[in-house]
Amino acid sequence: LGLDRLEQWLEGKACVVPMGEDMHISVRDHYARAPYHHGKDLALVEDIVREKYPDYVPAMEEYLSGTNCYFGNIFIMQKPLFDQYCGWLFSILEEFDRRADTTGYSTQELRVDGYLAERLLGVYVTHLRRTTGTQVYELPRVQFEPDNKKRVQRTLLNALLPPGSRRRAWVKKGRG
């Protein structure tokens, strides 16, 4: 797929995200169990959304209670939608930063705003679908490995434990 074909395909599309990954547990529970994540942080963000953006609460409940998660903060949006999303997202994260107590967090845990932003993208996309009728397109996510050994390991892992499979969820659940 060349740049010309990609630009042609994107013409008129308001929002494109990677395909969600079925975690087989709720997005909320997955967040709380994931390494370097704290459930209290997501709970605080939920409170902030309820206070600042009550019209987003139904989408937030639907997304966080569902099992399909959008990882990576990856998206393509038309500029007006992108501007709206950024205003919404950063107002929530700025309020989170004012209220949150991250004392004692490791360097990895201090990436909390990025972890939360991944979940908030899902909330925003769900809100778009529910309230505006915006068609959100999902494409497979591609990950390039710079090292052949890592590529072989990932290929093997994905063959044994396909992303979104119950087996993979079971193994992840056992670790968390």
Q: What are these language model-derived features?
A:
Residues 1-176:
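ER/Golgi luminal nucleotide-sugar-dependent glycosyltransferases, focusing on the catalytic module
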